[in-house]
């Protein structure tokens, strides 16, 4: 699955909340995780940070991982062979992960947990409650 080639990765974080193209790409990618016959699933992008990092963030957040785990997972890319070949630097990476974290944390209701806000986002982009439960079941069992 190619999430999208027309999307500029550096603005991925801001646009997943506003642009239908991004929402549709995420929905299609996430639907793959609803069917246990699709496992194991390997997903990647050019550096493993932008599209891959966004998808991994959503999946891990949906499964209840805490903020520290989400940040560590995302920042691992920085230490890969190609992790900083784009010259983004640690400050840019922190900005990107902060955009994801706070974008989801405050998505629907700031009193809701991160996981609840991610679930609300997934429902808003067209996944069903059954889809969400299937993803969790497939990843947690």
Which residues does each predicted region cover?
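Ser/Thr-glycine-rich phosphate-binding loops at phosphate-binding pockets of nucleotides
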Residues: 47, 51-52
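Cys-dependent protein tyrosine phosphatase-like superfamily
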Residues: 1-42, 54-141
């Amino acid at each position: 699955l190619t999430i999208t080639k027309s999307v500029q990765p550096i603005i991925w974080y801001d646009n997943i909340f506003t642009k239908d193209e991004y929402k549709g790409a995420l929905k299609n990618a996430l639907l793959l995780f609803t069917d246990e016959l699709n496992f194991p699933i390997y997903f990647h992008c050019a550096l493993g940070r932008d599209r891959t990092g966004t998808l991994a963030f959503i999946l891990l957040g949906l499964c209840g991982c805490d903020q520290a785990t989400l940040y560590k997972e995302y920042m691992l890319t920085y230490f890969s062979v190609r992790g900083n070949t784009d010259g983004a630097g640690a400050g840019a990476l922190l900005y990107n992960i902060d955009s994801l974290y706070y974008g989801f944390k405050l998505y629907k209701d700031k009193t809701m947990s991160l996981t609840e806000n991610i679930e609300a986002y997934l429902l808003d982009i067209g996944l069903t409650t059954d889809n969400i439960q299937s993803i969790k079941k497939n990843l947690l069992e």
